[in-house]
Amino acid sequence: FKPKGSNFNSLDSVILYPGANYYRTPPGIDEVNPGEYGLDFIIKSGRALIWPAYKGSMNRISDMNISFPRTQDHMRLFRQLLSNWTVDTSRTIDFLGSREEFNSNIYYVGMSYGGLYTTHVLLFEKRFKAAVLYVGGLTPNIPPMSDGKNHVPRMKLPVLMLNGKQDYLVPESAPRSMYAALGTPEEDKKLIFYDSGHWPLPRNQMIRETLSWLEKYKN
């Protein structure tokens, strides 16, 4: 999704890692709408919003249970899915680098599932300038070798975390644990709690904090 009137080498890119519904009962790939998450503000700000069809999501779902593993077999396949997401991410950024309209300012934005289960790609992909996590954190629901807990201390890039105090899906301990574990220097990580539930977060505050963060870490 690109803003109108973009010029050569002018676009920053925000790669979106969506919520759980895109791994369960997603819309058709041509029906994806950034406005569903209220993320159209990214496009209106003059940036491109990149929404890949990750393995296990949208039109690439083979078995929904792999993305929400409950058995040992599904857990084994989920671990493979982690590698698939890393490859999908690298290929997406390679593609952006091959197109003249995009510059090197590339950001990670994860919402819910994308702020919980896919953040390991931040360790393996060094081309991200910064990350924004909406209602994300560390989860104890799956073993450490899969949930990124072992990776988080090795992540050094700037990370903004926006969460709700009344979130019944992602309790306050989850983002606090991730924030404490991040290897990012203290001045380059930020955790904000709003008096809200899981989603939506207060829109005006979310927009202000997000755009300020992206602008702060661009080339």
List PLM regions with ranges:
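C-terminal catalytic histidine-bearing segment of alpha/beta-hydrolase fold enzymes
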Residues: 184-219
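Short beta-strand element of the alpha/beta-hydrolase
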Residues: 9-21
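Cap/lid segment of the alpha/beta-hydrolase catalytic domain
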Residues: 20-87
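Gly/Ser-rich "nucleophile elbow"/oxyanion-hole loop immediately N-terminal to the catalytic nucleophile
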Residues: 9, 67-112
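Short beta-strand/loop motif that positions the catalytic acidic residue
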Residues: 155, 161-163, 167
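Short beta-strand-to-loop junctions in surface cap/lid or active-site-entrance loops
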Residues: 1-10
